[in-house]
Amino acid sequence: MKVLVINCGSSSLKYQLIDMTTEDALAEGLVERIGINGSILTQKVKGREKYIVEQPLKDHQDAIELVLKSLIDENHGVIKSMDEISAVGHRVVHGGEKYSKSVLVNDEVMKNIEACIKLAPLHNPPNIIGIKACEELMPNTPMVCVFDTAFHQTMPEKAYMYPLPYEYYTEDHIRKYGFHGTSHKYVANKVAEVMKKDASELKTVTCHLGNGVSITAVDGGKSIDTTMGFTPLAGTIMGSRCGDIDPAIVTYLIKEKGYSADEVNDILNKKSGILGVSGVGTDFRDIRSAMGENNKRAILATDIFGYQIKKQIGAYAAAMGGLDTIVFTAGIGEHAPEVRIRALTGLEFIGVELDEEKNNSHDIGEGLLISKESSKVKVYVIPTNEELMIAKETLALV
């Protein structure tokens, strides 16, 4: 069976066609600048040159039509006809409280995703457009929604409830939701597999460190707490997002600096975090270069990053009443040993012993153990594979 995985952004679309018998990606691609001048599709197939198509794409339906044409293209495709696609798995950012697992698409599901637009105004609308476009072009193919928020729906009330007037929860659904759930679930299951244990036996802290950052306490295979909150702005410092700050800073900036609410939102989401502290950028390769030149602000940003991750690991070890393993994943988690060493140094008291040589290795493979053999808490670097997780969840429903 082959599953097509679709991830729609506001003007972009990522896709993978996965053969579920081998769990290999037959093709993967990115469509950029949808609805903007200069639309472009880039498709990669192992062992072949990149296939690039530049043509006007007025909307996501045009983009998905081009994706399907590219997959069945005589010279550049990987399948003979669309009939070979057994199902389509769609990444949907926000499922609210309604969905704790993936679901087959129907009218009721679509209404519920639309109802969550106010909770994810930037992400859910393009997700909906992508589903509708696929339904139009592939009317007989089952569609499945895989929600970023679903994995965290196992959090207890004491973890997800904010100490605000209770009616904000009952009337406006203001609570912690958490994000990156598909990634956290994948690596929590993968580390159990690598350790030859069942996920239900492990207390794990998963650290998804990319441009967005979230850390999750996974107890017995279930999320019991996570750092992102009502929105993906909460938690630790990120590429350009501030993470947790004193909420009164918001009213201070509005009153004292004369900013509008939208301007403050822009500052906290796009001008803060590692970018704001370092003044260098959000790409960690640039931060690393600046650190090499002894840029004090770049060093400070990295120190803050490592310190906040360390605090969170300690907090979640306390919340779970123990810790068996820590997993680092995503772009920075997989490729920034200088962040990992800052996050792990000082955790010896809970049983973490880092092997510095392994930590500096670039050969991650399916999973790299970076703690010493004697370490009570095992620390791994595991590449995330959200697309494969979405495909697995899709296959389970069709």
From Swiss-Prot:
ATP binds at K14, H208, L209, G210, N211, G212, D283, F284, R285, G331, I332, G333, E334, H335. The active site is at D148 (proton donor/acceptor). Mg(2+). Can also accept Mn(2+). Substrate binds at R91. The record marks H180, R241 as: Transition state stabilizer. The keyword Cytoplasm applies. Its main location: cytoplasm. Pathway: Metabolic intermediate biosynthesis; acetyl-CoA biosynthesis; acetyl-CoA from acetate: step 1/2. It is an enzyme of class 2 (transferase). GO terms for molecular function: acetate kinase activity; ATP binding; magnesium ion binding. The keyword Kinase applies. It is found in: Cytoplasm. Mg(2+) binds at N7, E386. It catalyses: acetate + ATP = acetyl phosphate + ADP. It comes from the Bacteria. InterPro entries: Ac/propionate_kinase, Aliphatic_acid_kin_short-chain, Aliphatic_acid_kinase_CS, ATPase_NBD. Its EC number is 2.7.2.1. Pfam families: Acetate_kinase. Keywords: ATP-binding, Cytoplasm, Kinase, Magnesium, Metal-binding, Nucleotide-binding, Transferase. Its cofactor is Mg(2+); Mn(2+). SUPFAM superfamilies: Actin-like ATPase domain. Homodimer. NCBIfam families: ackA. Catalyzes the formation of acetyl phosphate from acetate and ATP. Can also catalyze the reverse reaction. Belongs to the acetokinase family. This is Acetate kinase. The lineage of its organism: Bacteria, Bacillati, Bacillota, Clostridia, Eubacteriales. The gene is ackA.
